[in-house]
């Protein structure tokens, strides 16, 4: 994952597009207002904000509504915070249900082996998506998954090698600034996507 400074220092932009406003809810804030955290729920909260389905006076209520609508289950508890895990197949449909409860009409398409255009087409039509990535944890030797809101894309060319890199501009669920996810990274165990249309 690349941050903005790294991108502009080491790459030139070949093509890019992104939503007009970058939406994020950092993990410490979410934990402080909800006592809970799940990456998919945080990603969907950003998606909900994009479609004007989030009540900023009740972030905690909306977060827990998304938690419930996606069937997110408790994976662990630590330091008074409840952490959750969400099945990929529940993420898109659960978000559609959450939005319907807010009288916002959104459809979804989940792809378990998306190509790069799955995400670029979504952004180009003015919508938002969620990417789900799997990788083998160096700590446990087991698959670890993470879901992030996709708010743009950038095809980059490295200054030193001339290699082209396809990236997704994501809210990583942890911080407040855009990160560039390398879609071409060869150590992903799996990549899935949920694209919305609203």
Task: Describe each model-derived feature in a short phrase.
Residues 34, 60, 70, 78-79, ...:
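Feature targets compositionally biased, intrinsically disordered low-complexity regions
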Residues 37, 45-46, 74-156:
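Predominantly the structural core of cysteine protease catalytic domains
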């Amino acid at each position: 994952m690349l941050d903005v400074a790294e991108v502009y220092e080491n790459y030139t932009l070949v093509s890019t597009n992104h939503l007009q406003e970058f939406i994020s809810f950092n993990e410490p804030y979410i934990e402080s207002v909800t006592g809970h955290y799940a990456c998919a729920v945080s990603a969907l909260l950003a998606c909900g904000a994009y479609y004007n389905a989030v009540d900023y006076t009740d972030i905690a209520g909306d977060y827990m509504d998304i938690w419930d609508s996606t069937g997110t289950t408790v994976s662990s508890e630590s330091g008074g915070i409840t952490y959750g895990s969400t099945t990929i197949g529940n993420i898109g449909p659960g978000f559609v249900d959450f939005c319907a409860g807010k009288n916002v009409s959104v459809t979804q398409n989940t792809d378990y082996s998306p190509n790069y255009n799955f995400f670029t087409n979504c952004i180009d039509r003015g919508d938002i998506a969620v990417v789900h990535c799997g990788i083998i944890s160096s700590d446990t030797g087991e698959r670890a998954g993470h879901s992030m809101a996709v708010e743009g894309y950038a095809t980059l060319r490295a200054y030193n090698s001339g290699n082209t890199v396809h990236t997704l501009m994501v809210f990583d669920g942890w911080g407040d600034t855009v990160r560039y996810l390398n879609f071409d990274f060869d150590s992903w165990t799996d990549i899935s996507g949920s694209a919305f249309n609203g």
